[in-house]
Amino acid sequence: MENLSDRFNVLQDQLMNIYESAANTIESQIEHWQTLRKEAVLLYFARQKGVTRLGYQYVPPLAVSESRAKQAIGMMLQLQSLQKSEYAKEPWSLVDTSAETFRSPPENHFKKGPVSVEVIYDNDKDNANAYTMWRYVYYVDDDDQWHKSPSGVNHTGIYFMQGTFRHYYVLFADDASRYSRTGHWEVNVNKETVFAPVTSSTPPDSPGGQADSNTSSTTPATTTDSTSRLSSTRKQSQQTNTKGRRYGRRPSSRTRRTTQTHQRRRSRSKSRSRSRSRSRLRSRSRSRSRSYSRSRSQSSDQPQYRFRSGGQVSLITTATTTTTTATNYSTRGSGRGSSSTSSSTSKRPRRPRGGAIGGSSGRGRRSSSTSPSPSKRSRGKSESVRQRGISPDDVGKSLQSVSTRNTGRLGRLLDEALDPPVILVRGEPNTLKCFRNRAKLKYAGLYKAFSTAWSWVAGDGTERLGRSRMLISFFSFEQRKDFDKTVKYPKGVDRSYGSFDSL
């Protein structure tokens, strides 16, 4: 007990010396977090031994000490990585390297030079909100290289430049949906109006829009531009759908009644056309079933039909065991199909229950023929697959695109089952890279390959959308299942499943 108290007092003295010296060096900040880590570990150990007080200091629960120790370890690793870069010689204070500053937007980034940004909604000074823009943001790229990027503000939000991309860490439209009634706002930086509210459509510089040159960096100039993000479209929809508006049309007006009657007439005509099409389909299916029953007694003239049996491959493959040399359906004006066969087997393919012959239209269809052709050898493998199905061991083994010619619907479904499976993981870039490196050491053999970290880019701009992504490919679905059961994904990482035609 006394030994723990003495060690705890030594750590307290070290922290006091760091606070009093206030050295703005990165070495001093690393020492500060190392001391905090030792303090959290000591308090954790004391709590495990049943000690509730060390002198006048109350010993927190185990979960609190564990969380503080992990936080100190994380900050210490980040600072040690920053120490190896060219920015280690810059002054770093306790505020710059605090956990609160590191976790503030943009999260998990070191930043300096806070600037106050005030956004006034609906041109009402009492309806305002304050944000923080950082002059410089430090981030790590995919190659573990540190970069220093300036931050800026425009009518869309606050961003920092990540290479050639604008990474928005504050979007004014998110709070405008809660605080604004008209969808307009005014942006003020250091009590200077940067963007005044005007009536316009979607701003071209918003994420997914076109780039705009009227943006403000760390020393913004006074300009005027559109300040609504998706404001006009939302406002129009609200005015048309909301009842009792001041300038809205009354529900009992003549135009509203005429539009309602037109809508009712359209819905009635649609329902009548649907009922007529259903009755036609029923009559056609009955006539086809009668012709099919009459043709069962004729063993020489057998057309080859294609059935659909609710997705069960076994029922479909049993109906493809016959070998018809040439079966052709000619389309007549009456909508009936006549078939002519040169040779056929004595065994008749059985029709599965619940199947439908041909398509839903009244025209005849050409069935798949197995007559000899120059591509018979290349189709030999697909024909055998359609006859016997796919074994579980072959699922996910194909690495080539599926051909759409001479395979039919069933053959394409069976060939697509051979596509290699993948897992798409989403998270922070550093987290995904650490997960990839850990998987190479611990889970080798449970996957085929990892991709690099990548991101989606807006169609009309250069902004990155969402979090970073990474693909994991496998040889089979069983391997992916084993990987999913064995591997423990990092916290904050989401995953989804899929497959590709080729890799």
Curated annotation (Swiss-Prot):
Q: Which SUPFAM superfamilies match?
A: E2 regulatory, transactivation domain, Viral DNA-binding domain
Q: Which domain of life is it from?
A: Viruses
Swiss-Prot/TrEMBL keywords: Activator, DNA replication, DNA-binding, Early protein, Host nucleus, Phosphoprotein, Repressor, Transcription, Transcription regulation
What post-translational modification information does the record give?
Answer: Phosphorylated.
Q: Where is this region: Transactivation domain?
A: 1-201
Q: Supply the name of the protein.
A: Regulatory protein E2
- Any one biological process term the GO annotation gives: viral DNA genome replication
Biased composition regions of type Basic residues, renumbered to the chain: 243-293
Instruction: Provide the coiled-coil residue spans.
Output: none
The subcellular location is: Host nucleus
What gene name does this entry carry? E2
Q: Where is this region: DNA-binding domain?
A: 419-503
Write out the ranges of the annotated region (Disordered): 196-404
Protein family according to the UniProt entry: Belongs to the papillomaviridae E2 protein family.
List the record's Gene Ontology CC terms alphabetically.
host cell nucleus
Query: Which source organism does the UniProt entry give?
Result: Human papillomavirus 21
- Could you state a single Gene Ontology molecular function term? DNA-binding transcription factor activity
Q: What does this protein do?
A: Plays a role in the initiation of viral DNA replication. A dimer of E2 interacts with a dimer of E1 in order to improve specificity of E1 DNA binding activity. Once the complex recognizes and binds DNA at specific sites, the E2 dimer is removed from DNA. E2 also regulates viral transcription through binding to the E2RE response element (5'-ACCNNNNNNGGT-3') present in multiple copies in the regulatory regions of the viral genome. Activates or represses transcription depending on E2RE's position with regards to proximal promoter elements including the TATA-box.
